[in-house]
Amino acid sequence: MTGAVATAPARAPRRAPAQRPVSATARQMRRAGWWFLAVPLGLFVVFMLLPMGMAAVISLTDYAIIGDTAWVGWENYARIWDDTFFWTALRNTARYTLMYVPLGLVVALGTALLLNRSYRAVRLFRTLFYIPVVSSTVATATIWYWLLNPQKGLLNVALGWFGIDGPRWLYDSQWAMTAIVLMSVWAGFGTNMIIFLGGLQGVPGDLYEAARLDGANLWQQFRYVTLPSLTRTTFLVSTLLIIGAFQVFDQAYVLTKGGPGNSTVTMVYYIYNKGFGSLEMGYASALSFVLFLIILVFSLVNARLNRPGDSGRVRRRRVPAAVPSTVAAR
């Protein structure tokens, strides 16, 4: 006896859903979007990519404004290694960066914490603290030139009230860079303060409430709630500070002209002197690309250390009993 095997009827192949025809309005909007995108892309190519390409070519020549131009290849880059003044400028820039970046972070975050309130006068203080950002460097430098005057400057007069003999800020090679750092922090912390304020206002209030109910003090709230919530914001601000520190020029140019004793000659200041002082455009272009690589490396290292992509993940760590683990994990 043979059994019959039932076979299921073959299914007809599914047809792909028919695509809806794109309306004329959608095509016009898409075309308009490309036109709007073409304008900034065109400006970026004309004013960024083309100059960078031309600078890359010039860096391989002995180009000068006056005279003939010859192809020298990598000679300009090899010359940098033996240029002792380049290492002096790089060391001064590194010193400036090591002082400016941490101080700029602390001042901007501290001011943002003080202004993250609902008082009536907060808006006034936010405006006042932002005024130096929109002021010209020459005006700011003039103010600080008088503030740092060794005899009659307000800063040294205030130090004298406490029996401290103020230094000769702009005339002492040990203090000139510190004076430039103080001026730069004062002139630029307003922008970073606004960025931190935006980050602070995005922190959920229930995290602070949970921490307070669990007995956390203000320092514990700041350490386990505020700082972890500002990881991305801190990464952005620190990156901007690093880039700005390596590109510092106008403060040193206006206040000290690179002195005393070349103690405030920065990388950009040195590039400016080589390009427009000595008219060595090829060598100045090579220095510019070396500076670009240095900034890129430090920015990547900063991104690696901060790891903004991991800020949203829950990470377990040991915390004091006064702070709930759910708050610390955020």
PLM segments and residue spans:
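Short, Lys/Arg-rich, polar N-terminal cytosolic tail immediately upstream
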Residues: 1-28
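A structural signal for multi-pass alpha-helical bundles of membrane permease subunits
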Residues: 29-330
